[in-house]
Design a protein with these regions (language model features):
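N-terminal export signals
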Residues: 1-25
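Short loop/turn segments that connect beta-strands within beta-propeller blades
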Residues: 50-52, 93-95, 143-146
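A short beta-strand motif characteristic of beta-propeller blades
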Residues: 54-59, 97-104, 150-155
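Repeated scaffold domains used in trafficking and secretory/extracellular systems
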Residues: 63-69, 109-113, 160-165
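Residue-level detector of Asp-centered blade-edge/turn motifs that repeat once per structural unit
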Residues: 72-73, 118-119, 169-170
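Short, conserved, GDST-rich strand-edge loop motifs in beta-rich repeat architectures
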Residues: 126-133, 177-197
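Beta-propeller blade signature
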Residues: 137-143, 195-199
């Protein structure tokens, strides 16, 4: 296989998916690789790079991020806070500007993942309820015309410690991976390893 063929095939495999902590975004312009990073001082950043490795933006955020949820049609992405963060960050992918810091309700923390629906009108985030430790919650957020997310509902994840969530190909069925691990908002310490029940 020639180098050019290999690179083209590799690039095709990367398109639209997460590879080694990166996300891909392209919309009638040069593709952008998205990720989150920390510097030597422990500061956290949402970052975008060209395929040639040129940094387009490095937006400082308060909390370490885990996953990136890209809007299906707008140049927006939510950099989701790593468990047990109470913040996630909505970033303009054309400028790198922080548009909004999403904050969970007082009795919740993010579990690291979120997805937009196919039309990009609603966002679903995995969360933990700290009032009822271990109760998994899916936060529902509505994207308004000003491109801000507003909390509109809570759904049960039907398990403990929801982590990843994805749409099935029908676009109507949301699948949630409950890790079964109970943690509290103050640390990442697992509190129930002897009795965890993933689902």
């Amino acid at each position: 296989m020639q180098r050019r063929t290999f690179l083209a095939a590799s690039l095709a495999a990367v398109a639209g998916s997460a590879v080694l902590g990166w996300r891909w975004w392209s919309q009638e312009r040069q593709p952008v690789l998205l990720s989150a990073r920390d510097n030597a001082q422990g500061e956290h950043f949402a970052v975008g790079y060209t395929l040639a490795g040129e940094q387009l933006f490095a937006t400082q955020v308060t909390a370490r991020c885990h996953d990136i949820c890209v809007h299906p049609s707008l140049p927006l992405a939510l950099f989701t806070g790593r468990r047990p963060s109470t913040e996630s960050y909505l970033i303009d992918l054309q400028t790198g500007r922080l548009l909004q810091t999403l904050v969970t309700p007082a009795n919740r923390h993010f579990q690291g993942h979120a997805v937009f629906d196919a039309r990009g009108e609603r966002l679903y985030s995995t969360e933990n309820d700290t009032d009822e430790p271990g109760r998994g919650v899916i936060g529902v957020w509505q994207l308004d015309t000003a491109q801000r997310l507003q909390r509109v509902d809570d759904l049960s994840s039907h398990g403990v410690g929801p982590h990843q969530l994805l749409w099935l190909p029908d676009g109507k069925t949301l699948v949630v991976a409950n890790g079964g691990i109970r943690t509290e908002s103050g640390s990442r310490e697992a509190l129930n390893l002897d009795a965890m029940e993933p689902s």
